[in-house]
């Protein structure tokens, strides 16, 4: 067997259990029996929770009800259910909404329930255990609604009759959100509003009592209690700690050792198979078809949906080649997360099975993104000591366009390929969502050990169930000839199994601490001397600077803990863990998926981690290296194919200087770059990967694609605006449609690089958390420059200076710095919590602060220009109309409101319900008179409410001879006029530069 072929638990570890070497082999067996039993217990608990999620998926309530102890407590949002009978009735009648005894969801229903990111610990004594799991749920009805949910389970397990069951379930909600909007915070009620009383949910089976105290989750700021101590702090949080069994197992010493050796090998094999299927997912992401096909046995088979069966490694490779080119190309998103593995290894055999979930995010730049979710039922064979895929069968649950979601779109299962007919027809004929379909599972109920009770609607046939069942002959126990050799082998195997569990706990805890901004807890996961961290282009921080970096850069100088109204989920999954030969260090490849939200914008992000960990002298595993390779970031509105940003955060030397510069140059989707694997192919040892187009060439290609076509006419497409964008804006019309407008402009910004610009983020210009500014400065030295400050819109109650995964409004800051200015984007206090004149007061505070600090960024405090858009323009107008204490050099007003009507609700959120006060609060009359030079513009496709105010302002200033430049932007909309900043379309930016260079007098 060649080096590198065994991925996770190559059986080479020399694992010490204090003083074992000095004991006789017979004396060691009691401790080894306790260790192996503990390892088996952890495996059983994880199997229990993962299968729990699969049974919820398909409405298999009868099997699920068996998971609870007689006196179990289930603390759900709907209330607390006590005892197995009550929980059983809750599952059928409340969750399933079906009569007692009826299983299955029926057609047109999605109820996916991911159980992922485990931190599992066995309690002393081995009779109880605890686990923390993240839940991602997709609910919905075709033609009805679609909903996201995320939360945490804090579970308590207990052995009842020697079988692991759930003793207590506590669900802590993270968020629930409609698919249409994603995870954004709901509008906050007015300060004076009386909170509506919480009405208990009407249940078919009432709860036994109201729910126990729990973390309500986003947008509230709370932390679900951790059952474990910090895994890296002090003695850590061992996955188990056991003492030798005082009652030895039956049989003589060699018979006992033979049983232990068999079980230890089985547990180690389970982990190897888990890593094999996770490795498959990482190769699939990158379209490395050679590497994927290498994982199959020579006679292996592959079957996707209704496409038929391909037999043999060569045919597997041919089929994979039909999925796309060998290796990712620019603009191709192909993420395939492999989650929730349930692995069965037949004892003392070379056979194994797995059941796992795939969650895929795919698509091409500018086209519709696509969701796929489904189940793999695979078989494996061990040949020459190496596990290989014997058969792979993927059963999709649903396939749907990102733009529409699973309530509105449901694509059929792909059928046979006309240009590559399969070797055999599909194993079974079925339809996928919106039809109900339950694939056959290879395992029985892990509690009752009885066959599963499948739904009659969409369930598998008896033939399919029999074919899928894990079965086969097992060899008799291998006799032990040398007791010491056997004991050493058992010790080594169970030590490696334990190490993998503890490293997975470490990885999961990293994500949970990052979720809640627990920077010091996060820093405790690092080895204090050897630890290092490198994220994006921020540079490398080592040793004590890891904590300083986390606290000062991410914690903004000491902000610790969750913040109300902000979501920052860092979902850590799919770890491939490779232990060193001596068992003292490990390398870990894992995946991170982000769900982020602040204000009215939700976003996605992704990364691959290539980390390293060491086991200290105290036996505790800690990180020696964390290295994140960001892959994509995108707004929720447009998704990854239409609203992705390839920019990468750089160093923050003004906060904490890195110990060394970045070790690599990377750019996110739509650019594709090589992410190194710490391992060779686990089956063949292959290291070679298909070559990628250099990043610079990809960026040039994207810029070329973004080059505007010749306009069909000057009126339909201004110079620099691609004809496709012009047509898209015409189609949207006067509607403010952020998702569609973002989709038009995101590809143009994705091609842009800003290497000549330095940034400083989240500078505080006042005491409130919304008093924050980002500065964009040319790196090249020069004389003091004009400072242009952009004030965002958002209907007075939402919006931000920048949005995670989105180009706006960083595009304005970058544009300013690239044109010889200092750019700034700001946040300010929002309605309805803060009403008129809060916006003007914030600008007053800002300008005073700028006049004091502008020189720090190379800006001239005498040349400050305010640029407001929409509600931001109204705030700038109010600031000027009130008579600013610190005058500015000029102001740019883009599509603002200056004369208030009495029927627009968003104005009432900020300007108040008393419309009698509107005449004195409206800025128009005074704005006409101010002496500050103005550039006033509006867009041809602005909503009708905006245009009259602008026309009145322009007419009034012209009549009074006040300094002003005015312009109308043809074919632009309310959003596109700012989204276009930084692109080749200079309809607005060219006049702004001239205005700043020589303001009218």
Task: Show where each model-derived region lies.
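Short, low-complexity N-terminal intrinsically disordered segments enriched in polar/charged residues
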Residues: 22-54, 66, 234-282, 294, ...
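A solvent-exposed, acidic/Ser-Thr-rich amphipathic alpha-helical stretch
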Residues: 61-135, 289-358, 519-594
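Short beta-strand edge/turn micro-motifs at domain boundaries
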Residues: 128-132, 150-185, 189, 240-244, ...
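N-terminal cap/lid segment of alpha/beta-hydrolase-fold proteins
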Residues: 724-783
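Mobile cap/lid helix-loop segments that gate and shape the active-site cleft of serine hydrolases
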Residues: 747-757, 888-889, 893-926, 932
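Gly/Ser-rich "nucleophile elbow"/oxyanion-hole loop immediately N-terminal to the catalytic nucleophile
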Residues: 783, 849-870
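Short beta-strand/loop motif that positions the catalytic acidic residue
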Residues: 930, 936-938
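C-terminal catalytic histidine-bearing segment of alpha/beta-hydrolase fold enzymes
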Residues: 937, 944-947, 951, 958-1001
């Amino acid at each position: 067997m060649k080096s590198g072929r065994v991925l996770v638990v190559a059986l080479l570890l020399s694992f010490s259990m204090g003083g074992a070497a000095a004991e006789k082999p017979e004396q060691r067996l009691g401790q080894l029996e306790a260790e192996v039993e503990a390892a088996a217990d952890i495996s059983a608990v994880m199997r229990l929770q993962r299968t729990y999620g699969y049974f919820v998926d398909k409405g298999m309530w009868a099997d699920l009800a068996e998971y609870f102890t007689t006196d179990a407590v289930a603390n759900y949002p709907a209330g607390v259910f006590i005892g197995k009978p009550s929980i059983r009735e809750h599952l059928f009648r409340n969750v399933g909404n079906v009569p007692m005894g009826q299983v299955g969801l029926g057609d047109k229903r999605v109820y996916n329930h991911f159980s992922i990111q485990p931190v599992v610990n066995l309690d002393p004594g081995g009779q109880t255990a605890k686990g923390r799991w993240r839940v991602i749920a997709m609910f919905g009805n075709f033609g009805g609604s679609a909903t996201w949910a995320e939360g945490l389970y804090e579970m308590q397990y207990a052995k009842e009759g020697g079988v692991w069951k759930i003793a207590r379930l506590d669900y802590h909600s993270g968020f629930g959100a409609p698919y249409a909007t994603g995870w954004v915070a709901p509008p906050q009620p007015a300060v004076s509003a009386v909170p509506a009383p919480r009405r208990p949910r009407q249940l078919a089976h009432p709860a036994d009592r109201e729910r126990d105290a729990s973390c309500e989750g986003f947008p509230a700021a709370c932390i679900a209690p951790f059952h474990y101590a910090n895994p890296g702090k002090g003695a850590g949080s061992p996955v188990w700690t056991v003492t030798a069994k005082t009652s030895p197992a039956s049989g003589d010493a060699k018979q006992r050792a033979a049983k232990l050796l068999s079980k230890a090998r089985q547990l180690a094999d389970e982990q190897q198979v888990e890593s094999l299927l996770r490795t498959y997912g990482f190769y699939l992401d990158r379209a490395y078809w050679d590497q994927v096909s290498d994982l199959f046995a020579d006679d292996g088979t592959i079957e996707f949906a209704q496409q038929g069966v391909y037999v043999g490694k060569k045919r597997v490779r041919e089929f994979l080649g039909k999925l796309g080119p060998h290796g990712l190309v620019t603009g191709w998103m192909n993420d395939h997360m492999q989650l929730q593995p349930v692995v069965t290894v037949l004892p003392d055999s070379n056979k194994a099975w797995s059941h796992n979930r795939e969650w895929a995010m795919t698509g091409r730049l500018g086209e519709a993104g696509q969701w796929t979710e489904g189940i793999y039922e695979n078989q494996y064979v061990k040949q020459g000591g190496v596990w290989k895929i014997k058969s792979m069968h993927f059963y999709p649950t649903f396939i749907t366009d990102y733009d529409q979601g699973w309530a509105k779109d449901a694509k059929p299962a792909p059928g046979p390929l006309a240009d590559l007919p399969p070797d055999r027809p599909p194993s079974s004929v079925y339809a996928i969502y919106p039809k109900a379909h339950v694939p056959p599972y290879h395992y029985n109920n892990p509690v009752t050990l009885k066959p599963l009770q499948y739904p009659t609607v969409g369930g598998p046939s008896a033939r399919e169930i029999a074919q899928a069942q894990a079965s086969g002959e097992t060899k008799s126990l291998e006799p032990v000839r040398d007791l010491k050799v056997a004991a050493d082998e058992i010790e080594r195997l169970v030590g490696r199994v334990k190490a993998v569990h503890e490293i997975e706990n470490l990885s999961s805890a990293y994500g949970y601490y990052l979720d809640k901004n627990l920077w010091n807890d996060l820093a405790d996961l690092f080895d204090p001397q050897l630890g290092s961290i490198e994220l994006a282009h921020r540079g490398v921080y080592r040793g004590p600077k890891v904590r300083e970096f986390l606290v000062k850069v991410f914690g903004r100088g000491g902000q610790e803990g969750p913040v109300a109204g902000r979501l920052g989920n860092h979902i850590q999954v799919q770890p491939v863990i490779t232990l060193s030969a001596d068992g003292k260090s490990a390398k870990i490849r894992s995946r991170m998926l982000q769900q982020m939200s602040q204000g009215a914008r939700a976003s996605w992000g992704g990364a691959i981690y290539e980390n390293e960990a060491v086991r200290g002298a105290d036996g505790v595993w800690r990180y020696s290296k964390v290295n994140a390779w960001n892959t994509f970031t995108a707004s929720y509105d447009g998704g990854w194919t239409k609203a992705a940003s390839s920019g990468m955060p750089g160093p923050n030397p003004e906060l904490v200087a890195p110990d060394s510069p970045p070790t690599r140059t990377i750019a996110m989707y739509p650019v594709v770059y090589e992410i190194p694997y710490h391992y060779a192919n686990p089956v063949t040892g292959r290291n070679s990967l298909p070559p990628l187009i250099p990043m610079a060439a990809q960026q040039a290609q994207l810029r070329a694609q973004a080059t505007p076509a010749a306009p069909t006419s000057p009126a339909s497409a201004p110079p620099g605006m691609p004809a496709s964008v012009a047509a898209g804006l015409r189609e949207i019309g006067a509607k403010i449609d952020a998702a569609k407008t973002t989709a038009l402009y995101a590809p143009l910004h994705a091609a842009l690089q800003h290497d000549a610009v330095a940034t400083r983020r989240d500078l505080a210009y006042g005491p409130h958390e919304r008093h924050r500014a980002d500065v964009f400065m040319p790196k090249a030295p020069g004389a003091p420059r004009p400072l242009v400050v952009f004030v965002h819109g958002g209907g007075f109650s939402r919006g931000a200076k920048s949005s995670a995964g989105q180009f706006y409004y960083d595009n304005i800051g970058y544009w300013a710095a690239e044109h010889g200015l200092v750019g700034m984007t700001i946040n300010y206090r929002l309605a309805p919590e803060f009403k008129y004149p809060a916006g003007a007061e914030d600008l007053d505070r800002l300008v005073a602060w700028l006049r004091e600090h502008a020189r720090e960024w190379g800006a001239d405090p005498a040349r400050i220009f305010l640029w407001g858009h929409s509600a931001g323009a109204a705030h700038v107008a109010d600031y000027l109309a009130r008579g600013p204490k610190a005058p500015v050099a000029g102001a740019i007003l883009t599509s603002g409101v200056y004369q208030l009507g009495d029927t627009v609700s968003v104005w009432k959120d900020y300007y108040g319900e008393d419309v009698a006060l509107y005449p004195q609060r409206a800025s128009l009359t005074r704005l006409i008179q101010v002496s500050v030079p103005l550039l006033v513009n509006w867009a041809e496709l602005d909503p009708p409410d905006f245009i009259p105010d602008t026309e009145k302002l322009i007419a009034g200033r012209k009549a009074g001879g006040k300094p002003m430049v005015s312009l109308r932007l043809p074919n632009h909309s309310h959003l596109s006029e700012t989204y276009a900043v930084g692109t080749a379309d200079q309809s607005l930016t060219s006049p702004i530069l001239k205005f700043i260079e020589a303001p009218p007098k």
